[in-house]
Curated annotation (Swiss-Prot):
Residues annotated as binding Zn(2+): H101, H103, D114
EC number: 3.4.19.-
Protein name as catalogued: Probable TtuB-protein conjugate cleaving protease
Function, as annotated: Probable metalloprotease that cleaves the ubiquitin-like modifier protein TtuB from protein conjugates, hydrolyzing the isopeptide bond between a lysine residue of the target protein and the C-terminal glycine of the modifier protein. Does not seem to work for all the TtuB conjugates.
KW Acyltransferase (keyword) present: no
Essential cofactor(s): Zn(2+)
Amino acid sequence: MAPPSVPIVYAGGRGGCPGGYHGLVLYVPRGLLEETRAHLLREAPKEGVGLWAGRREVERVIPLPNVHPSPLTAYLADPLALLKALKALEREGLSLLAIYHSHPKGPALPSPRDIKEARWRVPYVIFGTDGVRAFLLPEGQEVALVVL
């Protein structure tokens, strides 16, 4: 996986705007970006999946098991692990900032399945063979990734 091709984000904005996007930008420290990349490389050739959480920027990477029946070409976060992670975030006062997953053999673009199955109103961060990008789905609007 190549380095990011675009500047990473948050639902809340770096300068304020609690609860909303500020200029459609997601901020992620380089170390957490690399931690995410390492998780996804360990999952290859399967698609990996996880969450980014924090307040004004990504503060935590939460890998989740991919329980999809076809994990080489799709992902489905384990529902129980997802629920436990979301409850822990709530207890800790952190917000879900993004859902990440990998396309180990394809580009960092939403697949038709990614678009069809999008349910969460947070950016979907996709790590592909050509880098990493983030999108609001199903609309397809790109979210800038600012690496700190």
